[in-house]
Amino acid sequence: MDTREGMPLLGDYFPEMTVVTTKGKMTLPHDMAGKWFVFFSHPADFTPVCTTEFVAFQKLYPKFKELNTELIGLSVDQVFAHIKWEEWIKENLGVTIQFPIIADTGVVAKSLGLIHPGKGTNTVRAVFIVDAKGIIRIILYYPQELGRNMEEILRAVKGMQFSDANGCSMPANWPKNELIGEKVIIPAAATVADANARIAKIKKGEIEGYDWWFSYRDAKPKQEKKTVTQPKSSSRTKKKQ
């Protein structure tokens, strides 16, 4: 495992590590190969804000799984503390936590830059969104006082996956942008010729836009109709026996 201290950057591969979790040992990012995953840290078990976060994450867990995305939690606590906390959440709040929680000794937290000395020895509320290739695509940091918005994290995963698949950019508050609604932004023209062509397309109504550098299209491009070829009927007829 890479033991360097400091936060990895966007575009970096998620550091390789073997960890102990409530679901057993895991090797990251290897065990998540082919899947996206949301790796998030929380300050401590049996704390009010963290409890609300875990309940919120679990409520949305099925939606994350629909996006081929797993959740992995972490704090500097022993695994029995995680298990007991899960039991408390189930018994008192009626929610079963189904995703793994890493029991960290502090090594992982330091390697990812999750501990800020000015805020104590607990991990901050960090989020790393990692794609199916093991590349870090989004990093979010929250202070201990503020719980995370899980709907926003889910939106971020959806947006990045859609952007990758369709070669577009996502506007603010997508899919409810104040200017273009659920439509997505077409990458800006890279040359003068491309810019002129883009303006021409806007004028012809082939695409929508305010200018060559701000054009957009439907989030779901119209698919070409597939021609269904009917099987040819045989000209042969069976003779009656």
Please state what every model-predicted region is:
Residues 1-241:
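Chalcogenol-based redox active-site neighborhoods
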